[in-house]
Structures are given as C-alpha cells and as structure tokens.
Amino acid sequence: MNAAELVDRAEISDVVIAYATGLDRRDWSLYRSIFVDELEMDFVSVGIPAGPYSADSWVRDARRLFAGFEATQHTSTNHVHTIRSDTATCVSNMQAEHF
C-alpha cells in the first residue's frame, strides 16, 4: 500500500466518522456535508423505508428524530475499505446508543 492509498482510506473513514459526529453533536451542517444530493438509504431494521431520499430531507428528518433524545453516541469500528479507481466502499460496524 502506498501513501496515496493510505490517504484515500483515511479520507473515507473521515466521512464515516463525520456521520457519527454530526449526529451526536447535532452538527447538521457537518452531517449534511457528507452526503451527495440524492441518496439511497436502507434503515428498514428500525422502521424507516428503504429508498431514494434527497439529502436535505434526510437531514431534516434526522434532525426531527434526534430532537427527541437527550444524548446519543454512535461508535464506528472495523473499517474495511475497497477502493477501485474512483469508486470506494467502506463497510464498518456501527453501534448506536440513544438516551
């Protein structure tokens, strides 16, 4: 692995970390910054229908949902990166606590 690949991996992990940090700090600008304008989300396991969403509506709905919690903690571990040319995937374990 060369230096450029290590930088790519770090930048990809930074996006995953910003996801958790944005939610936990209620930093909605940070949270919005990690998304492209149109997303494909799947949170069926918690009752949110899978499908396409606009990033703005996703963030707006998250903001509404998280207003009901006093605190949250999202922890992301075991980042596994697959990088091919200009396409990358990061699979990680996310543990979320909502209080």
Give the predicted meaning of each segment.
Residues 28-96:
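A solvent-exposed, acidic/Ser-Thr-rich amphipathic alpha-helical stretch
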